[in-house]
Amino acid sequence: MIIIDIMVKDAGWNDEKMLYNITEKALTTAMHHVSLENVVSEISLLFTDDEHMAKINAQWRGKNKSTNVLSFPAFPIKAGNPPGPMLGDIIIARETVVLEAEKQGKTFQDHLTHMIVHGILHLLGYDHETDDEAHQMEKLEREILQKLSIKDPYIELSINDKI
């Protein structure tokens, strides 16, 4: 069981119950898919706005702009290994996710679910720094999202639009 802690720092995220339900479903599906469904841990999600996200992105990545999702693992972990007592933190910027969903012709909830799955995989040690890592992570995302009845998010994206 994983405890989910949700914080909202933007009035635009007006349905905290929906955020929790999407997070719980994405987390349960992702953990089961990577055979970590019996892990006992905790995850924290902050749903914020672009302005706040830009500050965090500048502080931690040196990029003075917003981004869709940032993940901060509580402990270093090798992909496939079980996490410690605290999985980590995921931060999601509402305006960026809304804009990307519109631009890519996706529903907001489907794109938000994708961002949550993407963040969870980062917390579990997966990355996309190399081509091999990116292919592995995208494959997992596709498989998890398919289990959630969400279309392949990469099928129509150009290389410049990818996360």
Swiss-Prot record:
One term under GO cellular component: cytoplasm
GO MF annotation, one: RNA endonuclease activity
Superkingdom to which the source organism belongs: Bacteria
Cofactor binding notes: Binds 1 zinc ion.
EC number: 3.1.-.-
Binding positions (Zn(2+)): 118, 122, 128
Pfam families on file: YbeY (PF02130)
Cofactors that this protein relies on: Zn(2+)
Catalytic class of the enzyme: hydrolase
GO terms of biological process kind: rRNA processing
Main location: cytoplasm
Keywords in alphabetical order: Cytoplasm, Endonuclease, Hydrolase, Metal-binding, Nuclease, Ribosome biogenesis, rRNA processing, Zinc
Compartments in which it is found: Cytoplasm
Function as written in the Swiss-Prot or TrEMBL entry: Single strand-specific metallo-endoribonuclease involved in late-stage 70S ribosome quality control and in maturation of the 3' terminus of the 16S rRNA.
Protein family membership: Belongs to the endoribonuclease YbeY family.
Record's protein name: Endoribonuclease YbeY
